[in-house]
């Protein structure tokens, strides 16, 4: 089939990374992989029904979600025909995620999507990039919603900070005030007598890896036996590959596993390894959310980047994937970033981290704690300055303020336009490297902080809650804001400190959200607010058209009397 007319794909415009320069052409035979996003088979009122279902906290099975809101076979076929016409192969179709993964030669992808691909250099590293818009045939307008992976720049950063004692000396020296994850859990009054048994915690990683020997050493040191089960899942060819560099992604991977595993040692931990690209990251979220084999009830993600670093099509695609996770009852805990109110962008504006800024994420900010014995005597916003890091937080310039934050007093954005956006974060926990978490990485022990630690901390807590409740808490945000947080003592309200442009105060704030957890009391509030598991409603069936009624023969009346015509209800529903 010949495709003659093309149109620009909305939201696909891309610019080189800041400071990047073009460094030559690409080998036209270089093999590539690209993820094509498709529209939902639901449109109009059906999409509205999904929005309402999610906001009410109702859940669908993964099969039900695919049947109602996945990609239609006809749309998938259209993309398959398009791929074949350009010498591209279909590597994977994920109807529930509404994605088709294509593989092929660089030259063929460039022609298929009317783009110029080139080699770029940025700060000593190279990536495949493009500029401008992706174009698609007019026949696929409205069917294709995104094309990710043509550009394979590193899309996200890990949100961990190694304690200063490690950076200034040798790895192996613990910070004076570091804690084990168990001590942190006790300080936050996590419920006892629960292990997360029967739950699966999904963790998404965009690099690095873990070793079983490190896990054995760490958990045996905490006297946790047996060692939690940890399984690696490959996404888009990425593998569990430790680098041996404690300043690299290995520390992120081990921090996430060790914190979640210490808090919920009875839970099964599944780590989804994916390439650090927009396509790889999205595919990992989709695979974890729709995983019918491992079925995680909670997902922890400690990677992200400023909203301004993403294309509009990426923001839309990731947000849809997180909404899908919410629809099937999966809580997604996301680190809010470690660079304060600027999120590391030096343009003088405020920025929030994405995907944490999605309204379908449980965005996790950071605090600094002081313990008296095993109890918290003081807790403030984590802010160690520009070099030491600070909790991310602020107001989204992309996502409107969601209904669950309508009464949270979220201020308008301080940026030009004063957009009334989604407030970040939702909750918080200890993230200061100076009061950090002891970890075991690549054979060494040291202390780590950052909001990277808070996401798995909350994921572990929610796994305990899910075990106790006998069902997943699922999309927590509406219930959290409108019910749970209104109960006295469920969260510690942090009222002191700032993250740059935002200050902490009573109630929700753009530094620590609603506050840090009081675990046992939080579980009680969740139990009290939990409604019976809803019976899945069948997919709506079209209403039968009413049979036309025979028209009565008009009666002849004298002309001198007024004639009344009965109004027919035929055709009304």
Language model region names:
Residues 368, 412-415, 462, 466-510, ...:
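An often Trp-containing, charged/polar helix-loop segment at the C-terminal end
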Residues 1-2, 573:
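Sec-dependent, cleavable N-terminal signal peptides
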Residues 2-93, 101, 106-366, 391, ...:
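Substrate-binding/charge-relay-adjacent region of secreted/lumenal peptidase catalytic domains
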Residues 531-573:
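Ser/Thr/Gly/Pro-rich low-complexity, disordered linker/stalk segments of secreted
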